Amino acid sequence: ENLALSVIKLDSQIELFSTPKIYSHDDTMRFTALSAACAAYIHDIPPVDIVHFHDWHLGLLPGLLKHPDSPYYPKIVFTIHNFCYRGYCSTKLLSETKIDNFHLSNYQLFRDPQTSVMMKGGLYCSDAITTVSPTYAQEMMNEYSDPEIHDALSTRSSVFFGILNGIDDRTWNPETDPHLAENYDKSLLREPDLLFMKKEKNKAALYERLGLELNYSPLMCIISRIVEQKGPEFMKEA
């Protein structure tokens, strides 16, 4: 409630986001430009208390917000959903923004100063770091594929928290959800025939809403990339 939504568009560089694919070879360039635009926007609006960003894509943002000439310094929260994607790029690319040399050094790799990592700098420059569960937080702490990323996370471990991710079961409650044709609750686990009858009616209502021909093949829904990490093979096995 009472939240304002702002859309940041880079009209002067619209070609950066006019790619035929969601992901491409110039992702770091695109998100460097977006980070710079976001930093300029945040400095131009009335002071905010907290800036919360997600994954490596805006990893440059905290470094830009902590520039010595910044009008104020909001607290910054960095949430990592996927520790495997980190935003490796050239240091030259980041140096073309308004980031100062001190904060730029947080992004550079010690083993190769010409290479920087969006996630690495984001870890060092943020005030708090979160991820999607306590278990995943522990997995991240035990991940050594890049020792410098591991060192960055270990250094910030005192402000690193795993917070269990999930839906709000008060809103998305099958017992009360107004979007369902047939409501049900866990008590129907003891009455499987009635449960499957209700689920069948919900499936039919969904197919009708989507303009699909109803059939008796399994219906599964997942909002995800279809990659090995997500385990799509389990759907087939099910």
Language-model-detected regions and their locations in the chain:
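Catalytic cores of nucleotide-sugar-dependent glycosyltransferases that transfer UDP/GDP/TDP-activated
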Residues: 1-238
